[in-house]
Structures are given as C-alpha cells and as structure tokens.
Curated annotation (Swiss-Prot):
Enzyme Commission numbers on file: 6.2.1.5
Known function: ATP-specific succinyl-CoA synthetase functions in the citric acid cycle (TCA), coupling the hydrolysis of succinyl-CoA to the synthesis of ATP and thus represents the only step of substrate-level phosphorylation in the TCA. The beta subunit provides nucleotide specificity of the enzyme and binds the substrate succinate, while the binding sites for coenzyme A and phosphate are found in the alpha subunit.
Gene3D superfamilies (alphabetical): ATP-grasp fold, A domain, ATP-grasp fold, B domain, Succinyl-CoA synthetase domains
GO cellular component: mitochondrion; succinate-CoA ligase complex
Reaction(s) catalysed by this chain's protein: succinate + ATP + CoA = succinyl-CoA + ADP + phosphate
Pathway: Carbohydrate metabolism; tricarboxylic acid cycle; succinate from succinyl-CoA (ligase route): step 1/1
The organism's taxonomic lineage, starting at the top: Eukaryota, Metazoa, Chordata, Craniata, Vertebrata
Protein name: Succinate--CoA ligase [ADP-forming] subunit beta, mitochondrial
Species for this entry: Sus scrofa
C-alpha cells in the first residue's frame, strides 16, 4: 500500500560519513556499541588506548573506501584494521596510518589519505550477523535486511546463499512495530534470550534512519559477544543529498579530503559530475541523454572523460563552471556539448559556452550539438562570437567528429606539434 503517494524521482548524491562519526550517531541514539574514540595523532591513539585499559585494542583507519582490511598503506603497513596489545603498539601502528595514503581495490592507484584512526576496545563475538535498513523500490519504502552471515561481504552471501538473507518491509506511514523487529531477529537466528535486545537495537537504528534522512544504515557485523550482549561493531550510513537543507549538522561533517577535487567543485556548482578515464569531455543536460552521449562516443571508438549532467535549469555560470571542470582534467583532448532544450534554453547554454571558451582560452576542439528551445538564437550567438566552435545538428555526426578530433590531437601531441584548429562554423 503506497497510500496514494506519488513518488517523485530526484537526482541524488549520497553523503557518506566516516565510521567514527556514524558510531557517534549510534551512541546518541542509544544503540549498543564498543567503547572507543577517534585519534588524530599517534600520541592521541596512545592516550585513548591507555584510558580504555583493556589488554588489547583495535585500531581502525578512517578512510571512505571499502576493503580497508585488505588494503596497504604507503608506509608499507598491510591492512587498515589492526589489533594491538599495548598503548605503545597503538602509537606505533597509528603512526604508520595517520597522514598516509591507503590503497584498496576501491581506491585504485590514487589511494585515500587517512587523517585519523578509531581506537576501540576489542570485543569477542560469539556469533556475527548482518543488519541493514535501506529504501527499496519494490516495497516503495524502507526495508530491514538481516542475515545470519555477518562480518563477510553481503554481496557474496546474496550470490551464493540468497536464502540466508531475510527482509522485513516497513510501512513508512505506520512506522516500525516491535513484532516486526522481533520476527526479523528470530529469522536471523538470534538466541531467544537476546532476541528482545537485538530487536530494541533495530528499532533504535530505524528511528535514526528516519531522523537523519538516511538512504542506508548498514551494520556489519551486529554481534552476540562472549558476555551475551548484542553490539553493533561497525556502522556505515549514507544520507540523501536532497535533505541537506534540513540536515545541516550532518552535511557539515562531510570530509572533502576524501573526495576527488573535481567532485568537490561539481558539488559547489550543483552539477552532477563523475570523472572517468577517457579523453573526450562531455557536457549534456539530463542523465539519460548524458549516458546515451557516452554510449555513442564509445560506439564510434572514443572514450568519455566524464559524465556531466548540467540539469534542466542550468545558468550561464553553471555552464562556465562545467567547462572549468572538464578542462581541469588534463587528459581531455576534445569536448562534445549535447543539449536538447526543453525547459533548458539553448541560447543560455550558448552564452555559457562562448563565455567559457573566451575566459578559459580553450585550445582544444569543441563540438556543439544543440536542438530545441531557442536553438536558432543559440546558433547565431555562436556564429557571432568569432570563436572556432564546431556546430553540428546530428548527434551521430557530432560524435564521429569529436572522436576524430581527439585522435588528431593525440597524434599532434605524440609528434610534439602545436596545431591550431581552424574549424568551420
């Protein structure tokens, strides 16, 4: 039952927080977690380990990338999660993490800088479970997901033993009921003596999910420890960027050192940008058209350097910022602008293109394909600018042209020849 609500699709850029920040939110919500604190220097790590007073503590590198346990630091240290047995060892290990880049499968060769570590007590799990809350289209709302197989990659569990994953949809209007949480805890295999405790933690996590407009709360693992207590050992929370206006406290926590510089600039200019490995820059309005443009470039033997959707209501300023983003990538050898003007006016895009080409002194070829609202005004603006911008009405032709031009620029670079492009308007 969707209560007659019309679900409107929106562009979404999810915010991810560091584990220690997520754990602090869990603690505030009354969820059971191991004791621990974040350290920004080896000396702080020493002091926290000493204060915890347990015979062994866990040092966890704080980087926004998966697979840290199997990663390698530039210091040579293997693994982003380490068990240590003294405050001195905590200091030594954290000194090989803090201020160093961690390389994992997810980060690739760029790596991610580790600026802090989480120092926490070691607990001994008797059993590990997987628990998550996410939004699922098939249920038109939130769903609780649980599995008796925690502490491992849930994608592997889904592929190998899908029956080990259980789901409990929640009616977003009525909210979570205790019997739903209890039912899930039982299906996940929690012993009867701690089913209620597990269910209570699930309800608190669901309330946190709602309170902060999260798109996902993932606990892997949720455990029964050797004392028979239910604990959340790790937390990953994603937040919907559309809620930034009412979740200022959360969005102010964003760690920009973990983001690609270009993603940071794109977020400031309110552009949907993803950097890729190719050499043909793309500037398009609408995510669907942007993907189709990348496909047609690939079809003609080229490789896109980015996904960039300027959206339906782009301003001259945003178009200029989009060009800055594209040209900041030194791999880009040619640019294809593909605009279909519905709400978006082609003449506004043309003004932005002309301004960007002039201000940024763009030396690489720019191919522009414009169709729709005020297209004739746009073409006149480009023609009157006196700039060497190549206009083309047909997308297929435009794609062929931009691929060919990128090949020519590649050849001139290899031959170390400086070529000035005199393109017909």
């Amino acid at each position: 039952n969707n209560h007659g609500l019309q679900i409107q699709q929106q562009q979404q850029r999810n915010l991810s927080l560091h584990e220690y920040m997520s754990m602090e939110l869990l603690q505030e919500a009354g969820v059971s977690i191991p004791k621990g604190h974040v350290a920004k220097s080896p000396d702080e790590a020493y002091a926290i380990a000493k204060k915890l007073g347990s015979k062994d503590v866990v040092i966890k590198a704080q980087v926004l990338a998966g697979g840290r346990g199997k990663g390698t630091f530039e210091s040579g240290l293997k693994g982003g999660v380490k068990i240590v047995f003294s405050p001195e060892e905590a200091k030594a290990v954290s000194s090989q993490m803090i201020g160093k880049k961690l390389f994992t499968k997810q980060t690739g060769e760029k790596g991610r800088i580790c600026n802090q570590v989480l120092v926490c007590e070691r607990r001994y799990p008797r059993r590990e479970y997987y628990f998550a809350i996410t939004m699922e289209r098939s249920f038109q709302g939130p769903v609780l997901i649980g599995s008796s197989q925690g502490g491992v990659n849930i994608e592997d569990v889904a592929a190998e033993t899908p029956e080990a994953i259980v789901k409990e949809p929640i009616d977003i209007v009525e909210g979570i009921k205790k019997e739903q949480a209890v039912r899930l805890a039982q299906k996940m295999g929690f012993p009867p003596s701690i089913v209620d405790s597990a269910a209570e933690n699930m309800i608190k996590l669901y309330n946190l999910f709602l309170k902060y407009d999260a798109t996902m709360v993932e606990i892997n693992p949720m455990v029964e420890d050797s004392d028979g207590a239910v604990l959340c050992m790790d937390a990953k929370i994603n937040f919907d960027s559309n809620s930034a206006y009412r979740q200022k406290k959360i969005f102010d926590l964003q760690d920009w050192t973990q983001e690609d510089e270009r993603d940071k600039d794109a977020a400031k200019a309110n552009l949907n940008y993803i950097g890729l490995d190719g050499n043909i820059g793309c500037l398009v309005n609408g995510a669907g058209l942007a993907m189709a443009t990348m496909d047609i470039i690939k079809l003609h033997g080229g490789t896109p350097a980015n996904f960039l959707d300027v959206g339906g209501g782009a301003t001259v300023h945003q178009v200029t910022e989009a060009f800055k983003l594209i040209t900041s990538d030194k791999k880009v050898l040619s640019i294809l602008v593909n605009i279909f003007g519905g709400i978006m006016r082609c003449d506004v895009i043309a003004q932005g293109i002309v301004m960007a080409v002039k201000d940024l002194e763009i030396k690489i070829p720019v191919v522009v394909r414009l169709q729709g609202t005020r297209v004739d005004d746009a073409k006149a603006l480009i023609a009157d600018s006196g700039l060497k911008i190549l206009a083309c009405d047909d997308l297929d032709e435009a794609a062929k042209m931009v691929v060919k031009l990128s090949e020519i620029v590649t050849l001139t670079k290899q031959a170390q020849v400086d070529v000035k492009f005199q393109l017909p308007i």
